């Protein structure tokens, strides 16, 4: 199974990923947790489950790696380990996700893969990594946050505060969650 949790900033994507990861630890699954090398925020989510996962990683109950891309060496190393389930947070910051998934499927590994991350940038343009994996996903859960401008429960846009220099800029303080009305309306 390949599952994607997507949505805007502050919609609970990573928290949903961590919730399922914790369930898999109870089931004693062999787990790999993958994070992008460029995400240096020092935490996974803003929830209290964050400490449970960090503790499990520190106690070696969950293996955690940081990568820039799924190159052939990384993919082969992952396949050799025969993980039951792989969790990938902020997948859009990691290159070659499709190649990774196709290799898992071709090798018939029976490994479940859970993704979490944005599918679009703060200009509402799809990330290439999202476009590449969407057709391969068995399940997609799109989450909404709360609009910081009007309070709508349909906050599904990540609005960048200030001048944006790159398509991806790591840092929660640079963004806020807004609804479509505020994203495309006079508020902007």
What kind of feature is each model-predicted range?
Residues 89-91:
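Walker B catalytic acidic pair
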Residues 106-129:
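Sensor-1/coupling segment of RecA-like P-loop NTPase cores
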């Amino acid at each position: 199974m390949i599952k994607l949790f997507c949505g805007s900033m502050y919609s609970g994507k990573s928290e949903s990923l961590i919730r399922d990861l914790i369930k898999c630890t109870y089931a004693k699954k062999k787990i790999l947790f993958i994070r992008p090398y460029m995400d240096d925020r020092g935490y996974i989510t803003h929830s209290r489950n964050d400490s449970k996962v960090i503790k499990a990683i520190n106690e070696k109950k969950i293996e955690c790696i940081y990568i820039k891309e799924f190159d052939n060496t990384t993919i082969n190393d992952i396949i050799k380990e025969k993980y039951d389930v792989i969790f990938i947070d902020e997948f859009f910051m990691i290159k070659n996700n499709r190649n990774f998934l196709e290799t898992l499927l071709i090798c018939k590994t029976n490994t479940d893969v859970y993704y979490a991350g944005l599918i679009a940038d703060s200009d509402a343009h799809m990330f290439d990594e999202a476009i590449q994996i969407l057709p391969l996903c068995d399940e997609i859960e799109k989450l909404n946050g709360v609009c910081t401008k009007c309070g709508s429960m349909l906050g599904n846009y990540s609005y960048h505060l200030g001048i944006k220099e790159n398509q991806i800029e790591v840092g929660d303080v640079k963004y806020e969650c807004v609804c479509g009305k505020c994203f495309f309306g006079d508020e902007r």
